[in-house]
């Protein structure tokens, strides 16, 4: 079931559901230890993997410089008690650059979302954001660093969950109804929110 990926009510319902389920949610968290500059990871266990992905993004369209900030910008939601970071992804996250990054993740990388479905969405949606011209590579790189946060700052983050917007009509759920809360929990644990 496809739906408008920019439906503001969907995002509001997701947030309301999460606030209903968890007591300790931080909105728009920032992790200062999460640098987006590759050289800051030299000597760490993630450096080789990140270097391979970064190089693949540089080679994708020949754009070499797409990192313009020091650290990751704010994320969507963080549940400190569970050490879970939650990202809600609109269509602009499903690009060829993101597919290039995902295809270069190390074998055995543990995802907390269905990466194969995510790759399929990149192929199908092929979103493009050329303003500025490096934006697709930049977003793909920042998403990559977020995916690696459990390795970068394991004392704060155990997993990163990505919820694709537009794959389910979240706006039809009511956070005040127990049956909808139960349905929301089930959807988050299943793959039915992903386009087949």
Model regions and ranges:
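Nucleic-acid endo/exonuclease domains
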Residues: 1-196
């Amino acid at each position: 079931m496809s739906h408008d990926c920019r439906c503001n009510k969907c995002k509001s319902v997701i947030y309301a559901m999460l606030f209903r389920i968890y007591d300790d949610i931080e909105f728009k968290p920032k992790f200062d230890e999460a640098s987006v500059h590759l050289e800051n990871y030299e000597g760490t266990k993630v450096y080789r993997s990140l270097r391979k992905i970064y190089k693949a993004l540089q080679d994708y369209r020949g754009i070499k410089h797409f990192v313009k900030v020091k650290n990751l910008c704010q994320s969507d939601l963080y549940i400190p008690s569970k050490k879970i970071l939650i990202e809600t992804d609109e269509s602009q996250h499903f690009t060829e650059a993101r597919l290039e990054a995902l295809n270069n993740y190390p074998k055995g990388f543990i995802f907390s979302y269905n990466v194969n479905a995510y790759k399929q969405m990149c192929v199908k949606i092929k979103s493009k954001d050329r303003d500025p011209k490096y934006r697709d590579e930049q977003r793909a790189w920042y998403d990559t660093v977020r995916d690696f946060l459990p390795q970068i700052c394991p004392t704060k983050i155990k997993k990163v969950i990505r919820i694709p917007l537009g794959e389910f009509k979240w706006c039809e759920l009511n956070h005040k109804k127990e049956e909808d809360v139960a349905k929301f929990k089930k959807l988050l644990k299943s793959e039915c929110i992903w386009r087949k």
